[in-house]
């Protein structure tokens, strides 16, 4: 469907299960943000790609040099950014894997327990998201070292400098 030279990342949804493999949520995407990203402007601010259900082609793999100057927040997120900046990010709305949620997971599916903790201590949530914004901006700066289109460059520059606006 797509020429080989087009960088592609294809990903799917996951079912969230507990430690005993009981289904907790039929869709991880719907527990996270209720949408799956396919565009750069979405992916800059939020990653919806989980590496275990992602497939990439050689054209996308070749874009990742391993010589990035800025820290990568998450490898699957960076690959999704590359796909949206240079090719296609494709979502298939079908769970293809069980995501086992442990009670001590740091990342992963959002649970009621995590949400209650955030309501009780909003300052911790604020600090966490502030750090996430700064880290995602740092990660996105790597794209500016690559030959992106002028339109894509403008989107990325606006994103990485948005906190600098007085």
Located regions from the model:
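Secondary-structure boundary motif
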Residues: 2-4, 66, 85, 145
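Conserved nucleotide-sugar donor-binding catalytic segment
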Residues: 12, 26, 30-112
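Conserved donor NDP-sugar-binding/catalytic core segment of glycosyltransferases
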Residues: 1-25
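C-terminal subregions of glycosyltransferases and related glycan-biosynthesis enzymes
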Residues: 3, 43, 71-73, 78, ...
């Amino acid at each position: 469907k797509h020429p080989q030279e087009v960088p592609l990342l294809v990903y799917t949804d996951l079912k969230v299960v507990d430690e005993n493999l009981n289904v907790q949520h039929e869709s991880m995407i719907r527990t996270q943000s209720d949408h799956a990203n396919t565009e750069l402007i979405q992916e800059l601010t939020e990653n919806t790609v989980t590496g275990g259900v992602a497939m990439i082609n050689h054209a996308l793999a070749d874009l990742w040099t391993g010589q990035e100057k800025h820290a990568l927040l998450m490898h699957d997120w960076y690959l999704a950014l590359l796909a949206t900046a240079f090719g296609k990010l494709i979502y298939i709305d079908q769970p293809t894997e069980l995501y086992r949620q442990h009670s001590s997971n740091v990342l992963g599916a959002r649970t009621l327990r995590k949400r209650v903790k955030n309501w009780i201590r909003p300052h911790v949530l604020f600090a966490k998201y502030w750090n996430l914004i700064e880290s995602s901006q740092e990660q996105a700066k790597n794209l500016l070292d690559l030959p992106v289109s002028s339109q894509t460059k403008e989107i990325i520059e606006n994103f990485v400098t948005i906190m600098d606006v007085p």
